[in-house]
Amino acid sequence: MADNDIIHTVPEMRRIRGIHFVGIGGVGMCGIAEVLANQGYAISGSDIKESPVLERLRSLGVRVDIGHRAENIDGADVVVTSTAVNTENLEVAAAHERRIPVVPRAQMLAELMRFRHGIAVAGTHGKTTTTSLTAAIMAEAGLDPTFVIGGRLNSAGTNARLGQSRYLVAEADESDASFLHLQPMSAIVTNVDADHMHTYGGDFAQLENTFIEFLHNLPFYGVAVMCVDDPVVRKLLPRVNRQVIRYGFSEDADLRAENVRQDGMVTHFRVVRAEGEPLDVSLNMPGRHNVLNALAAIAVSADEGAGDEAIIRGLNNFTGVGRRFDVQGDYHFDGGSATLVDDYGHHPREVAATIDAIREGWPGRRLAMLFQPHRYTRTQDLYEDFVEVLSGVDVLLMLEVYAAGEEPIPGADARALCRSLRKRGLEPVFVDDPDKLQGLLASQLQNGDLLVTQGAGNVGAIAKQLVAQGGGHG
């Protein structure tokens, strides 16, 4: 029997039966909860409001309570929290009082990975898509991985799945440095950029050092898959004391993309390999940034034994990830309709990648964007970059900053961005009341426009409302 055919038996976490998640509806929490529930643990959790995610968990037998109360942790042997959960939370306090272990989400993910052959995907941008593509290729190759992803994989309808092999593919989160808990066999680094700098005391060198520390969690026989097109990753390469597979458009990449051609939502390119014949592939996602994400997935999957046919099928059949260039359908308004795309990107580099993909795939169409800045600190730190990138759209409507629990910062809000953009010759429309949005869109849009809802806050929910109000898929 081949090694890939062996069902990997996961040892029980000793003495642990009941596992309680505080904030179980969070994108980083629900996937781990789902995998553990499918392994047979008694999972419970709480959150502050209902959501489709909670309904899915309940369908798996998970007990979910709305609101945080001490009695919610009854029956728990361990309590799992995320960085979004306050240490004064009633359930966390009750766990400490009862001497029940309280562990961060990343530590529980690390425990899942410890019993498997872990593939961890790190980087400031592209983690979710790269993790999803890796899982898709490995599934096509019959490797049947468990995966935990920071977004909904459209083909699976969920962000996590318990596979029957020894493989676990998961995102590695640098935002709070929690990826240092992970000890994978293989690791991808897509890029390193200035974001979540409060975690690193505003010190970029500390961020770089933390990525090196993460890579050195690999065993000496592990492999680091790194994007040499990213200047920071290239700078870090000499410090990596592990085997490295380099990927990118650069001539010195071990896995290189060339002959890139975009046809709407489909991107065609050739994979040139240091060993083996070139491979022509088609990816069901637009943009050169997604070509890089695909190269990383190809590199790590091939290293684990995925063949060319599985790679071709995995990319060609890929149906995308929720809120990652997610085409919602046609939005109808007085005067015509616009194609509505929803995208999670909230860093200037991510917004620029979305704009570039649209310009490449839909040349000649006007680009209208409804943008919601995410966090006042990010808006302040990357203010000029946001102004530069947003000035590249044809029509811009802007919502107020999604605070994510932060206090407002003077001069780092949506009105300030609008003022700065007007100096660039763009006339952005500040949306002070989302209830007025339909009327504002009707006044700004033209028939045939491409409308993007962009950001990490509740703008994704607004996109769904627009589709419902404006005629849905058509």
UniProtKB/Swiss-Prot annotation:
The pathway is: Cell wall biogenesis; peptidoglycan biosynthesis
The entry's localization annotation reads: Cytoplasm
MF terms from GO for this chain are: ATP binding; UDP-N-acetylmuramate-L-alanine ligase activity
Gene3D superfamilies, per the entry:
Mur ligase, C-terminal domain, Mur-like, catalytic domain, NAD(P)-binding Rossmann-like Domain
According to its UniProt record, what is one Pfam family this protein matches?
Mur_ligase
Q: InterPro entries given for it?
A: Mur-like_cat_sf, Mur_ligase_C, Mur_ligase_C_dom_sf, Mur_ligase_cen, Mur_ligase_N, MurCDEF_pg_biosynth, UDP-N-AcMur_Ala_ligase_MurC
One Gene Ontology term of the biological-process aspect is: cell wall organization
Show the catalytic activity: UDP-N-acetyl-alpha-D-muramate + L-alanine + ATP = UDP-N-acetyl-alpha-D-muramoyl-L-alanine + ADP + phosphate + H(+)
| Keywords attached to this entry | ATP-binding, Cell cycle, Cell division, Cell shape, Cell wall biogenesis/degradation, Cytoplasm, Ligase, Nucleotide-binding, Peptidoglycan synthesis
Q: What is its EC number?
A: 6.3.2.8
Q: Which domain of life is it from?
A: Bacteria
Q: Which HAMAP family match?
A: MurC (MF_00046)
What protein is this chain from? UDP-N-acetylmuramate--L-alanine ligase
What is the source species?
Alcanivorax borkumensis (strain ATCC 700651 / DSM 11573 / NCIMB 13689 / SK2)
Organism phylogeny: Bacteria, Pseudomonadati, Pseudomonadota, Gammaproteobacteria, Oceanospirillales
